[in-house]
Amino acid sequence: MALEERHRIRSPSDPPDTAAGVRPLRLASASGAPFYDVVALLASAGGLSALGAILAGLPEDFPGAIVVVQHLEPRHRSFIADILSRRTKLRVKEAQDGDRLQPHTVHIAPPDYHLLVNPDGTLSLSHSELVHFVRPSGDLLFESVAASFKDRAIAVVLTGTGSDGAMGVQAIKKMGGTVIAQDEGSSEFFGMPGAAIKTRTVDFILPIDEIAGALVTLFKGEAA
């Protein structure tokens, strides 16, 4: 799959040789190792369907670890891991403090806890204060992923109200990572993707049915 230029959003910070709209091709290593380590997904209102569409489109051998923040009602038990596990061949689990990131695995933030990724690949849960009125916070997840994995991280902002994720995508971009936002046409609510796009750090704006394929392509190093 090739990511079409019409989806590429050029940042003012891009080097001059990307004026055509696509950054230079970065090739996978000779060993065939994936070009990225982790994908961080953020969703809010309308997000369950969007997350399901992405995970359903990823192959069983997708090499990356996936971490997810979905804004949830904090006072009730979450069944999101059970629901999403029926949509994908990947392993899906609710994250626990001290878990270690695993390839082919989706780690979902539990209700009312921030999910953080540490440099050693372990996960931490925090009940610290709300960030922009939400817990778990996509901003905190993205910032921790950026600090831990730098240019080997991809952040994806999906449907949702508000502006969670807008600060975090800037951290991802600052450390050399890649940012994807769901397009307006396929978003049930465009608040969060729109806020991310306004930061001018988004690399690709894609309809929901193209995001899984884009992730596979990026991990292969075929386009970035």
Positions of the model-derived regions?
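Strand-loop microenvironment adjacent to phosphate/nucleotide-handling motifs in alpha/beta enzyme folds
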Residues: 1-224
